[in-house]
UniProtKB/Swiss-Prot annotation:
It comes from the Viruses. It is a multi-pass membrane protein. The chain crosses the membrane at residues 123-143, 163-183. GO terms for cellular component: host cell membrane; membrane; virion component. It is found in: Host membrane; Virion. Keywords: Host membrane, Late protein, Membrane, Transmembrane, Transmembrane helix, Virion. The keyword Transport does not apply. It comes from African swine fever virus (isolate Pig/Kenya/KEN-50/1950) (ASFV). This is Transmembrane protein C257L. Belongs to the asfivirus C257R family. The keyword Cytoplasm does not apply.
Length: 257
């Protein structure tokens, strides 16, 4: 009984012929068509294309997805005729196929690949490269081979240029939301502090305008600043700095300054 990995390994054994017919490739001389085992790569490539179309706003989305599903079914039929088993297209994706190329017992890297992940350069030569990194082909050719070989194929799912714009928009909205909340709270705090300062100044001014202050008819208590001194701790309890007022009234320094 064949497994998905058996099918993938068979395809890898024939991978040097999967780009045929191509007169420019020496291994394709006399080869009129690619081996049917290469249908595995067709399905993997179609799965990537399907993933991109699934998250687009293009008006042709439904039509494209329908055609892709039909193409996948054709290759699935080919594989069914070869191996006599029903393979799920979801099992034939680049990031799942790469698991089949490692020896389960020794951990040795399998096939023609020097890395445990399907190397992009090798797949590119076969015409079956996975979805490129964000930035498309420009970024793909700009990065050194050593860097590309350290990036798992599965990461392409999240670095896909077709859907990355949505993640960037969401991130931008979150940043703007946080910035708005911080600015709003700061302005509210300043406005509230300003109103309290105005209220305090008005209170002092009203007290200083008492016509009977320092006379026998003085309406103030023995300490003319008693009410004000009692009020300062109230504002300090709310987090305000009352250093200037404490100094003016001859009081010791307080908190929040």
């Amino acid at each position: 009984m064949y497994s998905a990995c058996d099918v993938v390994r068979d395809a890898m054994a024939q991978s040097h012929l999967c780009a045929c017919p191509n007169d420019k490739l020496p291994q394709c001389k006399g080869v009129t068509k690619a081996p049917p085992e290469c249908s595995v790569f067709h399905v993997a490539k179609l799965q990537d294309t399907k993933f991109k179309w699934k998250y687009t706003l293009d008006p042709l989305r439904a039509q494209k997805l329908d055609q892709i599903n039909k193409d996948i079914e054709k290759d699935a039929i080919t594989l069914r005729l070869i191996y006599g088993i029903e393979l799920s297209p979801e099992d034939l994706e680049w990031w799942k196929m790469q698991r089949c190329l490692i020896n389960k017992n020794t951990g040795a890297k399998g096939g023609q690949f020097a890395n445990k992940y399907l190397e992009r350069q090798d797949l590119e030569l076969l015409g079956y490269s996975p979805t490129p990194l964000i930035g498309g082909d420009l970024m793909f050719t700009a990065l050194p081979d050593k860097v590309l070989r350290t990036i798992p194929v599965a990461w392409d799912r999240f670095l896909n240029p077709a859907i990355m714009i949505f993640f960037l928009i969401i991130l931008l909205c979150v940043i703007l939301g946080i910035f708005y909340v911080l600015v709003r709270n700061t302005l509210r705090r300043k406005q509230k502090n300003k109103l309290h300062q105005m209220e305090i100044k008005r209170f002092i001014k009203e007290k200083e305008q008492d016509p009977y202050i320092h006379t026998s008819f003085e309406s103030w208590p023995a300490d003319p600043n008693k009410e004000w001194k009692d009020l300062i701790p109230v504002y300090e309890a709310q987090g305000y700095c009352m250093a200037d007022y404490r100094k003016k009234l001859g009081m010791p320094p307080g908190p929040n300054c």
